[in-house]
Swiss-Prot record:
Molecular function terms, GO-annotated: rRNA binding; structural constituent of ribosome
Gene: rplI
Top-rank lineage group of the source organism: Bacteria
Protein name (record): Large ribosomal subunit protein bL9
Keywords: Ribonucleoprotein, Ribosomal protein, RNA-binding, rRNA-binding
Length: 191
């Protein structure tokens, strides 16, 4: 099916272009969301008549998205979840959880704007891309930890998945006199 794009769509085309897409993609995504029109004579004439208003609306949306992107750029958000000793989460962090965290901070982001290939299933620092507009993307850092204290330690660069990070290091056990002495064992075998 041929459609006229009403906005820029990644890997498809720019606003105003006539492109050929699969019927299901057009019927289930592009047409219902108002991102495209069927490419026929009446819709082409309608698009040309409304082109200036569509371009103005697109520029307005883009400038709003750029303002949000500037305020989000480089920010880190903490999500606290239960996890095992190895850092594996009991559950996962999905796009919905990221949207809720951003909403708590005052950012209005939709779930479909979060680019998350798979749910996050381990503690640590994760970079997530937000598609705010067809031409505006921003990367944020999601800090998944077991507590706010661990999130601060993780942000400083500490690894929380090793046994030392979980249980702490016993400095007294590392003193040189407590290490294995091979000569002492040889003496006991000779007797």
């Amino acid at each position: 099916m041929e459609v006229i794009l009403l906005e820029r769509i990644a890997k498809l085309g720019q606003m105003g272009e006539t492109v050929k897409v699969r019927d299901g993609f057009a019927r289930n995504y592009l047409l219902p969301l108002g991102k495209a029109l069927r490419a026929n004579a009446s819709n082409k004439a309608r698009f040309e008549a409304e082109r200036s208003t569509l371009e103005a609306r697109n520029l307005e949306r883009k400038s709003e998205a750029q303002k949000v992107a500037e305020s989000l750029d480089g920010k880190s958000f903490i999500i606290v979840r239960s996890a095992g000793e190895t850092g594996q989460l009991y559950g996962s962090v999905a796009a919905r959880d990221i949207v809720e965290t951003l909403a708590a901070e005052g950012f209005n982001i939709n779930r479909n704007q979060v680019d998350l290939n798979q749910p996050i299933k381990a503690i640590g620092l994760h970079t997530v891309t937000l598609h705010l507009h067809g031409e505006v993307d921003v990367a944020i850092e999601i800090n998944v930890a077991r507590s706010a204290e661990e999130a601060e330690r993780q942000a400083k660069g500490e690894s929380l998945t090793s046994a030392d990070a979980i249980y702490g290091v016993d400095e007294d056990a590392l003193k040189p006199e407590d290490f294995f002495n091979p000569e002492a064992e040889i003496e006991s075998e000779e007797e």
